[in-house]
Swiss-Prot record:
Coiled coil: none annotated. Residues 515-815 form the Piwi domain. This is Piwi-like protein 2. Required for the production of functional progeny from adult somatic stem cells (neoblasts). It comes from the Eukaryota. Pfam families: PAZ, Piwi. Residues 313-338 are annotated as: Disordered. GO terms for biological process: regulatory ncRNA-mediated gene silencing. The gene is wi-2. SUPFAM superfamilies: PAZ domain, Ribonuclease H-like. Expressed in dividing adult stem cells. It comes from Schmidtea mediterranea.
Amino acid sequence: MEEIPVKVAKLEANGSETRGKMGNRGGLRGTFRIVEPNLQPADITEKTGNIGRTVKLQSNFTKFSVLRSEKFMMYDSVFSQVGLSPKVKLQFIVRVCQENKLPGAFCFDGRRLFTSEKWHGESDIQEFSHDEKKMTLRLVSTILPETEEYYQMINVLLNNLQVMLGQERIGKGYFLSPNITKDEVPRNSGPTFFETNSFKVLGGFGTTLQRGTKPTGELTTLLYIERINRVLNDNSVMKAYNRRSIDQLIGRDIITKYNNKTYRISEIKEMNVDEKFEMGGRTLSYAEYFKERYNIRLTQGDQPFVLTRVKKPMRRERKKKDEEGVEKEKEKEAPEEKDMTLNIPGELCFLCGFSDQEKSNMDLQKNLGCVLKREPRERLDDIPAYCNWIKNSDAATGMCNKWQLKIDNKPLEIEGRELPPCDVISGGSKINEKMGDDWKFGRVQFDIKRDRKHEIDVVIVDRNDFQYKNFMNDVEQELRNMRIDARVGKVNTCGPNDVERCLNDAARSGSGCAKMALVFVPDDRVYAKVKSFTMSTGLLTQCVTTRNGTNRNDKRRKVVSSKTVMQIFAKFGYDPWTVEIKLRPTMIVGMDTYHNKSSKKSIQASVFSINSTFTQYMSFVVNSPKGRQEFHETLGKNFNLALEDFKKRYDILPQRILVFRDGVGDNQLQFTKNFEVDAMKPLIENIYKGNGFPVPQIIYVIVKKRVGTKLFNRGNNPNPGTVVDKEIVKPNFYEFFLVSQRTTKGTATPTNYNVLEDTRLLTKKGTMDPMAPNELQKITYALTHLYFNWMGTIRVPVPVHYAHRLAELVGKVHKGSNPVAINERIRNRLFYL
């Protein structure tokens, strides 16, 4: 008999009864969990705050109810015909259910069949036939309500509703068919459809279950509903292909319309459709394969092929012998995953999303903005529109009736709070009096010692240097306005291949003053050279694009020059502004990981605050550690250096270490808690004991920007500082949502903060309790005011954003397999700003 996968076997622990065996392919998928593990820190008793003004909000969640039963059946299905799509299989099951008058309700995910009544007799195996197709069902387990598997079954039901409504699965969501025309789109209700400039926007609805808490504290299950879109390009890879632009295609998503599957481009290779390959014991060409399998005739012999890496389940077979040693019928073993590379002709691959050039095409983005960037009042109609769409479909209504599925047709109303505004101070004056989250009209003043000299050399990667005189005049005027003692030094002009030579000259010239190179760059290649030089030599650089440097619009050019001067002196180590954050000695850490799609490398960056205002940071970056030992060594070394620097400045070690960690997916939370958090605590403990200090309080917070949750305040976006820590938060998490940035176009998306660890601190005066929710929420909001590249609040705390900027910069400019290194001269500078 086959081995039961772990997730199916866990049903027994939930009170379910496992009856049959099932391979990995049919096992319960671990990519999404409704009943998440309990990740709430052990010492936490209070998870909600109370400061700020209470506000009534709406969300894109709603209430729903579904069929209750003592237990449900889960079957593994095997079809006699190979290659049937999930949609065809579902249609087959519907016909079988009608012909055999099978009882109860059912839902199907392509392999697993869930039913509310028994569909088998005395044997756990049952066969059904229709129209020359045969399906074998094998009972795997019974499922009890309120278990993880029960909620997964309801998610399968919601996906089946999408199919009943005529949607097709593309990637992870359900959308209108890629081959649909404007005349076929449902009128008045249902998904949106838009066509323009060789682009097609396919609409759909995203639906997901989530556990929440009622105001009374009771557990509840909510349904998330939101319109979603998929952008398809009518141009195939073959049309878009150019040998010089291969790098722009690597890492992009494509769709193959013949089977509605999405892939990511790993490589592009020029091939011929008559080239042969082995499949199922046969040798055939690509042209023959697509003609036989999909009735598609390839039109061009030589063309670019998309190479994409996938994991393919491989089912092995073995012969089983009876007690007398006689071979019996072959029995299928559980499938194994095998790494494979698919070669797909470029004419069949259609690009999804936008290229960098298309993203910067203002006319294109304006045309599509009416669909992709919707206002809050439009989004509030998503839930009623979805409910009406179901009512207008007999098939979907019939399935809802069988499952007794009832969806409330109005958004869930919840309670939130608006945190008090933060005072932004520059030159001793408050500069955000008019608007708490925006101080672009405030006057920034740097606190620079008079005996400190600064020199800014200029490198123009363009032979026509006269075009940049107006910009340089604006820079010098801004220096005078800010009363900064700095002079513009030598101006060098060069070609793209000589930029390192000019930077070397700038690094060697001058003495006894802080040095900076202002570089005008024409493209990303030159920018990468400049930043790579910065990291290796320690020469600070400030880049300005050729377009901005030669802009003839005085107003726009002066805005850029003013921002450039501010960034230059922020990189020198001066603070344009500060926010008062009252904390006992604390170090705040930001961590993030950047994944380079084209090089397949991952870069991990971490920044450590080294001053009391949390404006200056020590930065580290490494190739992403591949094992536990490497991670421990890297983390320990970074913490040791940062804490040594902190001790030199203040003669003490911080009593509290607050870590904000980005780049962690939902299915990695348990691993992060067990791997990173549990590794960090003993490392810090050893450093403190070695220095004779008590172990600090450690708070570890996961920051998640990509969330589907939306919040609305009377049909508008919430004000900056709006926090929600009730009702839509998961009961076994210590989390909250915070809207920190003002959104004037489109709909604001809150950032999710999930606290994985919050320890107590043992001091001479006694035990210090974990950080109160009020304090953590206030600090988090205050840290969104300290990004020196924008005179306003940002979506995440600044340490996380700095770690993101650093990881992204290194990931894009670092070449080769050598370890990443940052010159010691700039380790304590915001050179990546």
